């Protein structure tokens, strides 16, 4: 792994951006990865169809937490449609490192929670509502 990208991920893991409860959140979604124990709640404050603010809370590995931190920085000011259009390839490219198949769910947990919040879901189709 390139040192620059490793440092980038470790920085976002150790100093996550937009971490903590978001007062006045209008859209919230909680998700988890039962295979590794990662958990995450993504909270959005939407105004006039745009993301005015975004925070996340949770616990997990460096990849899941860094990925969520990077996403929160990226989506502020975007429209809900722009947020809904973000895909896995975009998230994986933003991490800048190869992600093993065993860690894909870790890397994409933040995206899944972000999109769940953006869509106003309580659970993805075919999944049970996850308790916080």
Each PLM stretch: what is its role?
Residues 1-24, 28-29, 52-53, 78-132:
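C-terminal binding/interaction regions
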Residues 36, 58-66:
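Short, thiol/selenol-centered motifs that function as redox-active sites or metal-ligating centers
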Residues 67-78:
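Alpha-helical support elements that line or immediately flank enzyme active sites
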Residues 50-58:
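Immediate flanking context of iron-sulfur cluster ligation sites
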